[in-house]
Regions:
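Phosphate-binding/switch region of NTP-binding enzymes
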Residues: 85-123
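Conserved inter-motif catalytic segment of the P-loop NTP-binding fold
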Residues: 2-94, 98
Length: 123
C-alpha cells in the first residue's frame, strides 16, 4: 500500500533505506527504529501499537527477532558469566501475548525474521 507506514525494527543494520526503494517501497514511509535487545523491542512496539487506530495503514517489520539478546543475556556477558539464558523463551511467549491482541484488533500485519535452524551441520 503506497499510503502505509512501515515500522522497521532493526537489530542487524543490514538493510539501508535505499534497499526499500529498490523493491518499490518509498523510504520516506519507513520509520527506522534500531533496537539492541528484546526489551527495547517490546517497550517501543507496544507504545507504537497503542498509539495506532484501527484503519491506520501500518506494517511492522522486525529484522531480526532471532538475533536479539535479552537484557539478562547482555548483563551475563558484561559480568563475564558463561550461562544459558533460559528466560528468553518465556520472554518471547509474553511478548507475543502482549502484542498479538493489538495487531489483530487494529488489523496491523507484522513480519519477523527468526533465524531458527533445526540443525547446524551446514554452518
Amino acid at each position: 500500500n503506497p499510503e502505509a507506514v512501515m515500522l522497521f525494527y532493526d537489530s542487524e543494520f543490514g538493510s539501508p533505506l535505499q534497499y526499500f526503494a529498490s523493491v518499490g517501497i518509498d523510504p520516506t514511509r519507513v520509520l527506522h527504529i534500531p533496537v539492541q535487545n528484546l526489551e527495547e523491542l517490546k517497550f517501543d512496539l507496544l507504545k507504537q501499537l497503542q498509539a495506532c487506530e484501527r484503519g491506520d495503514k501500518v506494517f511492522v517489520y522486525v529484522d531480526s527477532i532471532g538475533n536479539l539478546a535479552s537484557l539478562k543475556e547482555v548483563q551475563d556477558a558484561t559480568d563475564e558469566k558463561s550461562v544459558s539464558d533460559l528466560s528468553r523463551a518465556k520472554f518471547l511467549k509474553g511478548f507475543y501475548r502482549i502484542i498479538t491482541p493489538y495487531l489483530r484488533i487494529k488489523d496491523i500485519p507484522m513480519v519477523q525474521i527468526g533465524h531458527i535452524y533445526m540443525t547446524m551441520e551446514t554452518y
